[in-house]
């Protein structure tokens, strides 16, 4: 009877394999868009305005004579050209030095005459040198199309957009939001990311590649508690 209750090695191996593979399937989930960067759709069709003969028609928005149509209303699309590039460096160098000394001439007569001059000298010195250097650089290029979420009275527009790309076994997320002035948009309805005010740009990834680039939970735990 005891022989049948004792688990075999193959059964234990199968159980361990199932437990190891199960978390991988549990972590797999469908990528959902971020509602904070959701597209804004155009409002209901605006009522038709009868031209009054003036050259400038407010209902047409910002449309220069020598260029094509540009985004100017809620729901309009605008393409952002990402040209982000940053580089920073910092270095520090500190050197200190300190020394001191003292000497006492002992008596040569009387009960303390057995001291020698070398027995009553003291000196100290301290030196310190520290050097530190740090540097960081980042760059991001490409294009993403966003929609106008809000138009302010002065014509400035709040834009936001998100792009999700599924490549093999991973997802790439590009999100952007910020303020754009109408005159910063060129004739092809493009605007540079460097011309976006209060810009929020993020580029993240999920999936097997992103998971492999992160430290494991056990290694992260020991790194947190390590005093070195």
From Swiss-Prot:
| Gene Ontology biological process | bacterial-type flagellum-dependent cell motility
Q: Which GO terms describe its molecular function?
A: cytoskeletal motor activity
Q: Name one GO cellular component term.
A: bacterial-type flagellum basal body, distal rod, L ring
Q: Which InterPro entries match?
A: Flag_Lring
Signal peptide span per the entry? 1-26
| Family per record | Belongs to the FlgH family.
Fill in the subunit field for this protein.
Answer: The basal body constitutes a major portion of the flagellar organelle and consists of four rings (L,P,S, and M) mounted on a central rod.
Provide the protein name: Flagellar L-ring protein
Q: What is the lineage of its organism?
A: Bacteria, Pseudomonadati, Pseudomonadota, Alphaproteobacteria, Sphingomonadales
Q: Which gene encodes it?
A: flgH
């Amino acid at each position: 009877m005891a022989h049948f209750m004792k688990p075999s090695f193959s059964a234990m191996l199968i159980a361990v394999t199932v437990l190891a593979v199960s978390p991988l399937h549990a972590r797999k989930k469908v990528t959902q868009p971020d509602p904070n960067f959701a597209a804004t759709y155009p409002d209901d069709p605006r009522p038709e305005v009868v031209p009054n003969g003036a050259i400038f028609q407010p209902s047409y928005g910002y449309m220069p004579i020598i260029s094509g149509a540009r985004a100017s209303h809620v729901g309009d699309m605008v393409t952002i050209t990402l040209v982000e590039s940053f580089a920073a460096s910092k270095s520090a160098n500190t050197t200190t030095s300190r020394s001191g000394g003292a000497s006492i001439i002992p008596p040569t007569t009387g009960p303390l005459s057995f001291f020698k001059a070398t027995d009553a000298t003291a000196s100290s010195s301290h030196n310190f040198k520290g050097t530190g250097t740090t540097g960081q650089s980042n760059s991001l290029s490409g294009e993403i199309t966003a929609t106008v979420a809000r138009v302010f009275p002065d014509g400035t527009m709040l834009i936001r957009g998100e792009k999700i790309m599924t490549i093999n076994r991973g997802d790439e997320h590009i999100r952007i939001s910020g303020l754009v002035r109408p005159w910063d948009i060129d004739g092809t309805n493009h605007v540079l990311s460097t011309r976006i005010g209060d810009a929020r740009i993020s580029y993240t990834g999920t999936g097997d590649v992103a998971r492999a680039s992160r430290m494991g939970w056990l290694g992260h735990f020991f790194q947190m508690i390590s005093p070195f």
